[in-house]
């Protein structure tokens, strides 16, 4: 469980913008990340070593989901086989909003542009985790910019996991094998506006991420909330020039319990008198090891990443038909608040 924080810390990555950062600067940065991941599990990262700006990132969302973006028919041509049985893609591509589900979003996902396609990747699973990306036929520039953004975030993740290793008392190369045939996912998300007639405040139910690291670009609309140890939901609005980093369940396991994967959700934008409900865009990047990567914790536990991922996917709505019931281990916000109140009493 996280500590009793009231806001997210801010960590500057200015040291990573240097062509040759000093060992002392890198050690200090690793120490900051250790503190963050031991307490909040979330932080803002500023002074980013990226060429893509905030506007560049959300222009991709607007070109895909916006008023002048793709029609629903065009998006469904890219939909996963779960939603369009005649389509070939099972893991990458588009997923539509699910009627009746609390997670009100649609998304477009792509993987590592250079990932090796494995003929045995599916095994006994219906999902091919190393399949090629799918893109709309035009414009070609959209493909290129998505791939470039993915590459930049993958490179930043590689720098961060090197620091993570140092923070855990390991050599900086300890996680280098995670980068081989990485399955990292870039996800463009659109949370449509919710009609006032629909009494729903949560647009993404409380959860932790399942993998290693998540890097999140969020727009100015906001809505991200992070849960502290008291069960309070702490708003994490957009900070100019920042992205948000958080660790997933797997990195918490790798740390031997030293670090925490913190619950978070997203709420609808605040209601304003006479103002139309507003949607939002969000662009998370999930840093993931390769399909056959053996992920080992510092206390000796091991798991094959592909097996871990396939197990987690069973509970993700975008890989289920609309008729599939939600898993019992997904708690509503009300359920979580009740649980936390009982914990306090006990």
Feature locations, PLM:
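Peripheral, non-catalytic segments flanking oxidoreductase cores
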Residues: 1-346
């Amino acid at each position: 469980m996280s500590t009793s924080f009231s806001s997210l810390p801010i960590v500057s990555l200015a040291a990573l913008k240097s062509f040759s950062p000093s060992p002392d600067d890198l050690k200090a940065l690793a120490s900051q990340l250790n503190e963050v991941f031991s307490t909040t599990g979330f932080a803002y990262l500023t002074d980013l070593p990226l060429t893509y700006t905030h506007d560049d990132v959300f222009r991709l969302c607007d070109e895909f989901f916006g008023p002048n973006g793709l029609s629903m028919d065009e998006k469904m041509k890219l939909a996963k086989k779960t939603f369009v049985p005649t389509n070939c893609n099972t893991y990458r591509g588009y997923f539509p909003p699910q009627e009746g589900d609390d997670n009100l979003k649609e998304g477009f996902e792509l993987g590592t542009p250079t990932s090796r396609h494995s003929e045995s990747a599916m095994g006994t699973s219906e999902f091919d985790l190393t399949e090629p990306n799918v893109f709309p036929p035009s414009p070609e520039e959209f493909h290129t910019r998505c791939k470039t953004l993915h590459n930049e975030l993958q490179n930043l993740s590689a720098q961060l996991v090197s620091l993570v290793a140092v923070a855990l008392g390991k050599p900086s190369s300890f996680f280098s094998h995670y980068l081989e045939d990485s399955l990292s996912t870039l996800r463009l998300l659109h949370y449509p506006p919710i009609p006032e007639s629909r009494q729903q405040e949560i647009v993404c139910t409380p959860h932790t991420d399942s993998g290693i690291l998540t890097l999140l670009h969020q727009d100015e609309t906001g809505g991200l909330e992070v849960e502290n140890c008291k069960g309070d939901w702490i708003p994490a609005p957009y900070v100019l020039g920042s992205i948000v980093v958080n660790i997933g369940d797997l990195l918490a396991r790798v740390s031997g319990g030293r670090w925490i994967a913190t619950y978070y959700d997203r709420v609808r934008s605040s209601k304003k008198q006479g103002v139309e409900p507003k949607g939002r865009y969000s662009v998370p990047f999930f840093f993931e090891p390769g399909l056959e990567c053996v992920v080992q914790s510092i206390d000796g536990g091991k798991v094959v990443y592909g097996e871990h991922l396939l197990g987690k996917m069973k509970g993700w709505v975008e890989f289920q038909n609309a008729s599939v019931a939600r898993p019992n281990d997904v708690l509503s916000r009300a359920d979580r608040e009740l649980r936390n109140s009982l914990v306090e009493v006990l």
